[in-house]
Amino acid sequence: MSDKELIGLAAEARAASYCPYSDISVGAALLCDDGTIFTGANIENASFSPTVCAERVALFSAVHAGKRGFVAIAIVGGPVGEPPSKLFAPCGVCRQALSEFSDGNLRVIMTDGDSVTVKTLGEMIPLGFTSDSF
């Protein structure tokens, strides 16, 4: 699957966002090593701490389905009803969650609508805390 196709699926996933507080919808598409794709959208909550980011919705859906190998995740975000206009990178909690189930080679694909930026998870969370830290 191409980066562009994965970005398209992340953009489609934004439609399922529940974001009445920020008015920012985010979609994610996670590519598993067997070609399966899981999508997610952010789900907000009035008390904020229970809010779940799109990346974790996709990741936890994949893990719940028994997947453990991941190749790439695409993230697309912006104000509800508008095309993406800036990069949305995974927050620290999402980076940590992704690192639990992938090595530093997971490709993180982000777009501002005009250009695409690709980083590895290792670049985004250097010296990350993993099970090897025990």
Stretches with model-predicted labels:
Residues 10, 28-29, 58, 62:
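Small-residue (primarily alanine) positions within well-ordered alpha-helices
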Residues 3, 8, 91-95:
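Charged, amphipathic alpha-helical segments
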Residues 1-4, 112:
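Intrinsically disordered terminal and processing segments
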Residues 22:
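Active-site segments that bind and position negatively charged phosphate/pyrophosphate groups
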Residues 39-134:
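Zn2+-dependent cytidine deaminase-like catalytic core
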Residues 25-31, 109:
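Short beta-strand scaffold segments in enzyme catalytic cores
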Residues 4-19:
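Short, basic/aromatic recognition patches
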